[in-house]
Amino acid sequence: MAATASQAHASSAGATCLRNTTTRGGGDDDAFFPCDDDDDEMDGRDYLTSVLSDDHVPQELRAYYESFRELRDQRLWYQLTLQVESFLRHPASQERPRHIDLYEHFIRTFARHINHLVLASMGVIVSRQYEHAADALAFLQRLATETDQPETQDAHVLLSMEAAHFQLLLGDLSSTRAAMDRCAKLLDSFDAVEPVVHASFYRVCGNYHKAKAEYADYYRNYFLFLACIHVDAEMSKAEQVQCAHDLSISALLGDTIYNFGELLLHPILASLQGSEYAWLADLLFAFNAGDMGRFEALLPRLASEPMLQAHVPFLRQKLCLMALIESLFHRSMYDRT
């Protein structure tokens, strides 16, 4: 069954990336599209006229389209950018392919006047409306190619990593890995970069390692991702629960993770309370305390998590080692040898 683009973005928060961009308006230096001309302006007007003549357009969106026309005519690019961002967030605009049409027939006509990273972020949001992941991938790859210029490398990294997300969804692990390696080198070359770019990078890297069951690498990358976003503002409750679940499983199965303090202290773990995974938090605390009795009491719950159930011997061994570490830690310094 072909994956949809909306499914691909069910967990990405980072993809809600219109925040963390310091400048909404742009100048010629910010452009990664050819300069708009009279034909572009006319095309944009024709599109808006066509939309406003459509009786099926929701009433709550008509004010947006009317303001688009007015602000475009007055060349108030900053205000127009803000209106477009608001439109893309509006629940009534989520019907497919409203975002795609707006981007292709209107946003592109004044793209040179938008900050390149804001424009790229708009493209990421638009990609969610493609019905098939392959179409979303082609769209983002086109934008990534257009931004592969010295002055727009941060936007190029953002778009490349979001394209890599769809490559991962389509099972193309080698292309995903290639994008990760290339973008890592680009990020290392930057003096500074907006959090939205790092968030996209770490999120996709984390999901790549999750797909390969590389627990420690997933754990490390997803904590870096969480550090780049406002969790409550950018992740739904369901996304937070899934993230806390995945981090918990990775902490338990990671063969180099013997300290759960970072996870136990992170607000994301509280999302498990009241969920079907609440017992995972209890299990983490049992491991962190080296509490074998608590582990045995929770052992029947592992049947609901096949990955944990398949690694019970490893978990016992890990708990014994963590219990030893806990015991040594609490011994007085005079008793240690």
Language-model segments: residues:
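"A position-specific structural signal for the A-helix of alpha-solenoid helical repeats
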Residues: E162, F166-L169, V197-A211, D246, ...
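Short coil/turn linker motifs that delimit alpha-helical repeat modules in TPR/alpha-solenoid proteins
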Residues: E151-T152, A192-E194, E234-S236, V312
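Amphipathic alpha-helical segments of tetratricopeptide repeats
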Residues: Q141-D148, D181-S189, L224-A233
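Eukaryote-biased activation of long, low-complexity terminal tails and linkers
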Residues: A2-F139, S160
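Alpha-helical scaffold segments of alpha-solenoid architecture
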Residues: K212-T337
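Start-of-helix signal in alpha-solenoid helical-repeat scaffolds, especially tetratricopeptide repeats
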Residues: I100, I114-A120, D154-L159, V197-S200, ...
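TPR-repeat structural position
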Residues: Y130-A133, L173, Y215
